[in-house]
Amino acid sequence: MSYREPLGEYDCHIDNTRNMPPDTTIVSKSKKGKPARLQVDPESIPDDDRPPQTGNVFNIWFLKWSGGDSSTKNYTKSKFRVNIKKDSGYTKAPSNAPLCLFFARGCCYLGKKCSYYHRLPSDTDYFIPTQDCFGRDKTSDYKDDMNGVGSFSKSNRTLYIGGLHMDDKMENTLTKHFQEFGSIDKIRVLHSKACAFVTFRTENEAQFAKEAMQNQSLDGNEVLNIRWANEDPNPEAQRQEKRRLEEVTVNTVKNLLDSVSQTERKTKKVTVEVPDEIEETESSSEIKALPSSETSSGLFNNSSLNALKQFQSKKRKIDKPQPKENLPTMLGYSSSDEE
């Protein structure tokens, strides 16, 4: 007898396909996608891999110190960077889990065992309005330096990109590095101030790109400083943004109405089909109940017992004595005359 190795995670036993029709298509388990790979080996990360101490408390979410001198001016290039094509994959994240912040930064060491999603934000994602796509709580207003998670009172899709080394192809360079994280609506480069503004299609894409490209470099040795952009003071830009929000609202309402109409159609189909099934089950149960009513344990069946009960009730009515008030009419005198 030949020995066969144990089946792997994506292995398929060939003997199960012998009785299948020739046109049968076998769906492989690998359709689920590839697992998320380890971006960083846990053993390669030292315990003191953090920026120089400039405060009293180190914030692991923002990778900087607080409670002391400001460390915002001490920019150092990040050792890690996410590669969406190589690093994306399925994880153990539940359906309502946010995206992995450390995956966006390129330094998640859990891989497919991570409890957060390792992918880009999509249009079907729903995140709590008071949180970003990574599950961090927003604030009512922006920080003074326009850094951090952002504000829940306003939707912002534009990022401020500082620390650029300007050249004539800067717009193309920014497009090449930032289009990996989402659809870009527009890019505005200010050569005199060595900065640029990148506007994404959705706020979730801007949130992901901000964390992915913070402290990264483009084609040179620059270190990017990425923050949230202030509102554009141009009246025409404000009008365009207002029209865009109105279009988004109209499309959202249309999608909701379409979903409601589809659910109503499904419920109507169900309500029409259900009574037919109930009638069939009731009629079948009645047909099955007929022979059981005729056969019963004992001397008499159920129908005979019911007939006897009806006869007994009629007999009681006949044998019931007449009331005393009818006696005087029969004898001709009442009880008072007898006295």
Swiss-Prot record:
CDD domains linked to this entry: RRM_cwf2
Region called Disordered, residue ranges: 17-52, 276-339
Keyword Metal-binding: yes
UniProtKB keywords: Cell cycle, Metal-binding, mRNA processing, mRNA splicing, Nucleus, RNA-binding, Spliceosome, Zinc, Zinc-finger
Zinc finger (C3H1-type) stretch: 94-121
Superkingdom of origin: Eukaryota
Gene Ontology terms: biological process: mRNA cis splicing, via spliceosome; positive regulation of cell cycle; positive regulation of RNA splicing; spliceosomal snRNP assembly
Annotated Gene3D superfamilies: 3.30.70.330
Pfam family, one: Torus
GO cellular component terms, A-Z: post-mRNA release spliceosomal complex; Prp19 complex; U2-type catalytic step 1 spliceosome; U2-type catalytic step 2 spliceosome
Coiled-coil region(s): none
Residue stretches making up the RRM domain: 157-231
Comp. bias intervals (Polar residues): 292-311
Xref: InterPro entries: Cwc2/Slt11, Cwc2_RRM, Nucleotide-bd_a/b_plait_sf, RBD_domain_sf, RRM_dom, Torus, Znf_CCCH, Znf_CCCH_sf
A molecular-function term among this protein's GO annotations: U6 snRNA binding
Localisation per UniProt entry: Nucleus
Domain notes: The C-terminal RRM domain and the zinc finger motif are necessary for RNA-binding.
Similarity annotation: Belongs to the RRM CWC2 family.
Subunit details: Associated with the spliceosome.
Its biological purpose: Involved in the first step of pre-mRNA splicing. Required for cell growth and cell cycle control. Plays a role in the levels of the U1, U4, U5 and U6 snRNAs and the maintenance of the U4/U6 snRNA complex. May provide the link between the 'nineteen complex' NTC spliceosome protein complex and the spliceosome through the U6 snRNA. Associates predominantly with U6 snRNAs in assembled active spliceosomes. Binds directly to the internal stem-loop (ISL) domain of the U6 snRNA and to the pre-mRNA intron near the 5' splice site during the activation and catalytic phases of the spliceosome cycle.
Name assigned to this protein: Pre-mRNA-splicing factor CWC2
Phylogenetic placement of the source organism: Eukaryota, Fungi, Dikarya, Ascomycota, Saccharomycotina
Gene label: CWC2
